[in-house]
Amino acid sequence: MNLRKMTELNITGKKILIRTDLNVPIKNGVIQSDARILAALPTIEIAIEKKAKIIILSHLGRPKEGCYTKKYSLFPIFEYLKKKLKKTKIYFSDNHLKKVEINSGEILILENVRFNVGELKNDENLSKEYANLCDIFVMDAFGSAHRMQSSTYGIGKFVKIACAGPLLISEINNLKKALKNPKRPMVAIVGGAKVSTKFNVLNKLAAISDTIIVGGGIANTFLAIDNKIGKSLHEPKFILKAKKLRDKYNNIVIPIDSRVGKNFSHKEKCTIKLSSNIEKNEEIMDLGDKTIKKIIKILKKSKTILWNGPVGVFEFPNFRKGTEMIAKAIAENNGFSIAGGGDTLSVIDMFQIKDKISYISTGGGAFLEFIEGKKLPAMKMLEENFHK
């Protein structure tokens, strides 16, 4: 990669604009999970130590562009960081055009970039306004690296120096570790609702993995190739594509038994049945015990594990066993494990295995697009800026 790295630049006394990912769940002004903030902190702390003048940009949620909405404000994150970085002076501004002077080693947090008209459409004028705020732009938001927006892409055209932050570099290096010359056997676990959103990822992973395990609605679409699956969530239009993929690689583990229920409900009781024996009024909501046992056996032997998505409706107590047992098997594995995607992070939090996964990615869409082999717009921007 031909790009600049923040750690290789002299940032002392310079105004640096860090585009980070502080898109955390907030309920009634209270942060529900600080995982992304904690991931972003080391970069901020390096900048403080180097006595840079630090300006922070981030998005939060999906507000209506141009409209301030309190529930999407970064103010709770500003308050969180004030408590976390007690020795550092931190300021907050609700307008990126409002001039706020800060000294070396101080931080200015700007309001949610998605309140700014033109952010999502990569508006040139907004990109210029961001560029005018700094001497150096630091792209550190891997979770937004797949978005061609003003604060993640457009700014690179107008800022003199754009560089990659330590978190972004770490994300890329760890994904490459899993995807290029992984220690074998390599196992990929892909769960979630829709094959359609992850088909290209499945195709890529099936080609490079020794075994690929599918779960959730994705597994149901594979099951529907040869079985009647009642009212289970699946995508009929993708059954033929799933069949071609299965037949081409012959390394996809499809559930031999499943936990089923008659109603999609938190209190629904489960029955374990062979996946070939599902009734019309039943829906598959988790893996069965035989399948779980088979998967755990595979995971015990693996040296590299890439994990994206739960394998069942883990939010329902009676349908979380598959996801829980797989999560714990990954945690007990001594090889290299990497996990990514919003629901995957929720599972990791639920079963308290954060410290037992080798690397937890902050990316969802970016994580999947990188696996697919797509060039992420943020990486393209950094390379173009390097050659300016």
UniProtKB/Swiss-Prot annotation:
GO terms for cellular component: cytosol. ATP binds at K198, E315, G341, G342, D343, T344. This is Phosphoglycerate kinase. SUPFAM superfamilies: Phosphoglycerate kinase. InterPro entries: Phosphoglycerate_kinase, Phosphoglycerate_kinase_N, Phosphoglycerate_kinase_sf. It holds the Pfam family PGK. It is found in: Cytoplasm. GO terms for biological process: gluconeogenesis; glycolytic process. The keyword Nucleotide-binding applies. Monomer. Its EC number is 2.7.2.3. Belongs to the phosphoglycerate kinase family. One of its GO terms (molecular function) is phosphoglycerate kinase activity. It catalyses: (2R)-3-phosphoglycerate + ATP = (2R)-3-phospho-glyceroyl phosphate + ADP. Substrate binds at D21, L22, N23, R36, H59, L60, G61, R62, R114, R147. It is an enzyme of class 2 (transferase). The keyword ATP-binding applies. Pathway: Carbohydrate degradation; glycolysis; pyruvate from D-glyceraldehyde 3-phosphate: step 2/5. Keywords: ATP-binding, Cytoplasm, Glycolysis, Kinase, Nucleotide-binding, Transferase. The gene is pgk. Its main location: cytoplasm.
